[in-house]
Amino acid sequence: MSDMHSLLVAAILGVVEGLTEFLPVSSTGHMIIVGHLLGFEGDTAKTFEVVIQLGSILAVVVMFWRRLFGLIGIHFGRPLQHEGESKGRLTLIHILLGMIPAVVLGLLFHDAIKSLFNPINVMYALVVGGLLLIAAECLKPKEPRAPGLDDMTYRQAFMIGCFQCLALWPGFSRSGATISGGMLMGVSRYAASEFSFLLAVPMMMGATALDLYKSWGFLTTGDIPMFAVGFITAFVVALVAIKTFLQLIKRISFIPFAIYRFIVAAAVYVVFF
């Protein structure tokens, strides 16, 4: 792969990662399809995907830095105003409770989960995840019990963490699982999305660090320019995607995202089968 071609591939995959990582559409499904079409597969490709995920995570940190600092007791300026009443009740305990179920299962079954990374499993996960989004929209309480982040209870945070375990199934979508779970637990669509983003920071940083440690040997100095382009592209695109998504869900439901997942599942079938 020539230098210019590799940088173009990196930029394309960075855009795909940044656009899809925090939307309920499965970044894994998109990366598998696009990587296959671009002929970028194998151990280097897997390491590259891990690195550009860090770019997406950094975008969340930049977008929610005040809230993240607030969780550890460091406050800047006036209190944050979020969707619903802001009473300053969201704590680090909520985040920890949301992490525990997936962390435990992920550590216990890490190798088994990695073995599920194949097109057919991703295809099925896309469909089931889409059905869950539809179920969440249809079955959610008429009036959310937690309209804002600071109205969430510990129980709701833990149950969202249980739903997050579904995302260990490659292609399911971590944000899709957590947002759907939050809505079914009575958290508003907007607050569930915000909590999903906040929960992503420690969850994805931990998972990415573990994957990077295990795949570091596949990274060479010649890969650095390509990895840097992918990282920066994913960061910039994720910033725009997160901001746009949070504005969009104030006006529309998740049904269009569910339909889109079914289309991507069909695309996986066409490309790989």
Swiss-Prot record:
GO molecular function terms attached to this record: undecaprenyl-diphosphatase activity
Substrates-to-products reaction catalysed: di-trans,octa-cis-undecaprenyl diphosphate + H2O = di-trans,octa-cis-undecaprenyl phosphate + phosphate + H(+)
Record keywords: Antibiotic resistance, Cell inner membrane, Cell membrane, Cell shape, Cell wall biogenesis/degradation, Hydrolase, Membrane, Peptidoglycan synthesis, Transmembrane, Transmembrane helix
Membrane topology reported for the UniProt record: Multi-pass membrane protein
InterPro entries recorded: UppP (IPR003824)
Top-level taxon: Bacteria
Enzyme category, top tier: hydrolase
Additional notes on this entry: Bacitracin is thought to be involved in the inhibition of peptidoglycan synthesis by sequestering undecaprenyl diphosphate, thereby reducing the pool of lipid carrier available.
Function recorded in the entry: Catalyzes the dephosphorylation of undecaprenyl diphosphate (UPP). Confers resistance to bacitracin.
Protein name, as recorded: Undecaprenyl-diphosphatase
Source organism of this protein record: Escherichia fergusonii (strain ATCC 35469 / DSM 13698 / CCUG 18766 / IAM 14443 / JCM 21226 / LMG 7866 / NBRC 102419 / NCTC 12128 / CDC 0568-73)
